[in-house]
Amino acid sequence: MNNLGRILFLVLAVVTAIWLNYEEGTTSAPSRQSIASGASQDYLLAVSWQPAFCEQRPNKAECRSQRAGRFDTSHFSLHGLWPQPRNETYCNVSSETVATDKSGRWSRLPKLDLSVGLRNELERKMPGYRSYLHRHEWFKHGTCMPGFSPERYFRVSLDLLDQLNASAVRELAAGNVNTNLGFRDVSHAYGRAFGNDAQTRFILDCYRDDGRRIVHELKLSISGDLGETTDLATLISAGDVVGKSCPGGIVDPVGLQ
C-alpha cells in the first residue's frame, strides 16, 4: 500500500470510530433523554388560589361545586408542573392528541392510568380534575419528563404542593382572605419558609376584576433531579431567578364578588 493509500485508510478508520462513538452516545452532547434521566432540570410549579380562578370562570364544574370550607378555599390548588423552557411541551405526543388538547376538548383526551387513591387526592387538591385539567397537564407537560408515568408525575406534583401548603405562605394567604396582600408580604413569608434565596424564585400573578386586583396564582421556580429529591426548599434554592411579579392584590373569598 502506498503512502496515499495508508493516509486514506487512517482517515477512514478515524471517521468510522467517531461515527460509532456518536451512535453509542459516548461522544458529542448527551441527548435530551439522557439529560432528563439523570441530571438536574428546571421547572415551574404553578399553584392557583381557586376562588380567584372561579371568579373568572364560575361555570366550570369545579367552580359550580365550590363551597366555603372545601380544601381549595383555604389552600393552594395544583395547576401543573412544567418543565422549562416554556416550549418544552407535547413530547412524543401524536398530532391528533395535540390538536384535541389545544382545542380545549380535554374530556376527549386519552384516559390516564391513575390509582384510585391518586384520583381521589387530585379531585381534592386539583379541582380542575373535574374539568379534565389533569389530562391536559399530562399531555402538554408531563410527557416531557422522561421516565415519569402519569402516576409518578402527579405524585411528585402533589408532594411539592403539600409542602407549600404546610408553609407560612399558605398561612399568609388563608389568614388574609378578602384583604390586600402585597408582594413584599408574600416574599417575606416565602423567604421564612424556604430560605432568603427563595424571595427571587417565584412569580405572583394577579388579574383585574371590576377595579379590584386579585391574587390568582403562584409560580415557583425550582431545579433539581425530581427522581432524587422532592424537598421543596432544596429545589427552590437551586431554581432560576425569575421575572417581574404583580405588586399584590386581594386574596379572593369564595363566591362571586
Model-inferred region functions:
Residues N2, T26-A29, L118-Q257:
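C-terminal, well-folded lobe of enzymatic/effector domains
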